[in-house]
Regions:
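Charged, glycine-rich active-site and insertion segments that engage polyanionic ligands
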Residues: 1-60, 64-84, 88-91, 95-101, ...
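Conserved alpha-helical scaffold flanking the Walker A/P-loop in AAA+ ATPase domains
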Residues: 26-31, 96, 100-101, 127-149, ...
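Residues at the beta-strand->loop junction immediately N-terminal to the Walker
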Residues: 43, 154-155
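Flexible beta-alpha connector loops of hexameric P-loop NTPases
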Residues: 120-130, 157, 201
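Conserved catalytic/switch belt of AAA+ P-loop NTPases
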Residues: 141, 166-180
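Loop/turn-to-beta-strand initiation segments
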Residues: 146-151, 176-182
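Conserved Walker B
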Residues: 156-160, 172, 188
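Conserved D-loop-proximal element of ABC-family nucleotide-binding domains
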Residues: 162-163, 193
Length: 371
């Protein structure tokens, strides 16, 4: 689904952010302390609002709401907790010039660093390269035109290659005055330790059911409460994940998956071939990826249950008998092998043009124990 068809705004244009009040209070407390770190590592699972939060901070700074210079976070500050704050907000009026400029990507004091376009292939790169990172140094040494702050959002820092990471590290080690760097990360543990140590870590949490329901009711007003709850549980508190699932027809796919899984270890060949056959057609690549991701997640839930010695909470009431029966079908090691196999097959399908129908059938035969 293209971004222009989305029913929800891009992070830079989003005015709605819920469930991250603790993180917001932490940043506001740092602003008032007079010791605002110049670099923030905004971390958490995908789809919970990290990039939206980064742009929320950017608007706040560019709106002239931060007084005093930024400070070097320094290695010793990485784990220190800041006092929380109550009663304030990072909200900037959506009708303001700053908000509109940030949303349009035209604010002169804001630089967004993302994966760029490969000039040779004209396709999006798979990583942020050193040329992207080098733009940051030149940008930060220019004179700010408005609030006095120059802000850089890197979304996501996980996608930087080593050369790009080293270029950003040099900036973090010697930041110019009134520079604010906001690094979005899904997996902070994989970053260079020296990058992590130069940033104030700000963890964002998956959203609770009430916050997810509020957001889904806003973005998907046509959906029932039952469907909103299904999306919430399937996405594990990720609003981005829930909206992407909805766009890909994930709810119907999950119900069909559960219908097939409920029959295991027996499989009805006609139903399996009908389900797998829908992914053969051109244009159904996203649906295939979604179905396989849902299947991998289902297997992962069973593997965790096997390790803990207790059944996972069913997402749909009708899947409980299948969970109970299948938990004893394989050992923990076998469930882990199946999880790896499904993920591996999914990754290789488009890379080497495997038959998507046969991949789905093969995955179910493996679950059955005959593949």
């Amino acid at each position: 689904m293209s971004t222009e068809d989305q029913a929800w705004p891009e992070p830079r244009a989003s005015s709605l952010l819920v469930g991250q009040e603790t993180a917001e209070a932490t940043f506001l407390a740092a602003c008032r302390s007079g010791k605002l770190p110049h670099a923030w590592l905004i971390a958490g699972p995908p789809g919970i609002g990290k990039a939206s939060f980064a742009y929320r901070i950017a608007r706040y700074a560019l709106n002239g709401s931060i007084e005093g210079p930024a400070q070097d976070a320094g290695p010793s500050l990485f784990g220190d907790a800041l006092p929380s704050s109550e009663g304030d907000s990072l909200t900037v009026d959506p009708d303001s010039i700053v908000f509109r400029q940030v949303a349009a990507g035209s604010h002169p004091d804001l630089l967004s660093v993302e994966r760029g376009i490969n000039e040779r292939t004209k396709k999006e790169r798979s990583e942020i390269v050193v040329e992207d990172a080098r733009r940051v140094a030149g940008f930060l040494h220019k004179t700010a035109s408005g609030s006095g702050w120059r802000v850089v959002v890197i979304d996501s820092v996980d996608e930087m290659n080593r050369n790009a990471a080293n270029a950003i590290l040099k900036i973090l080690e010697e930041p110019p005055a009134n520079a604010l760097l906001l690094l979005v990360s899904h997996s902070p543990g994989r970053l260079l330790p020296t990058i992590r140590s130069r940033c104030r870590l700000l963890r964002l949490s998956p959203l609770g059911e009430a916050d997810m329901d509020r957001l889904l009711a806003h973005y998907l007003p046509e959906e029932t409460g039952e469907n909103r709850l299904l999306l919430t549980r399937l996405s594990e508190g990720s609003i981005g994940g829930a909206l992407a699932l909805h766009a890909a027809g994930g709810m119907a796919l999950y119900r069909d998956l559960v219908g097939l899984l409920a029959g295991l270890p027996d499989l009805e060949a006609r139903k399996l071939h009908a389900f797998a056959g829908r992914f053969e057609r051109a244009g159904n690549e996203d649906a295939f990826q979604t179905a396989m991701a849902l299947l991998a997640d289902w297997i992962a839930r069973l593997a965790r249950a096997k390790g803990l010695g207790q059944l996972p909470q069913p997402i749909l009431a009708e899947e409980e008998p299948a969970l109970r029966r299948l938990a004893s079908l394989h050992s923990l090691d076998r469930w882990l092998e199946l999880w790896e196999k499904v993920r591996h097959l999914t990754a290789r399908t488009d890379a080497i043009n495997l038959d998507r129908k046969q991949v789905v059938i093969g995955a179910f035969l493996a679950l059955q124990g005959t593949g």
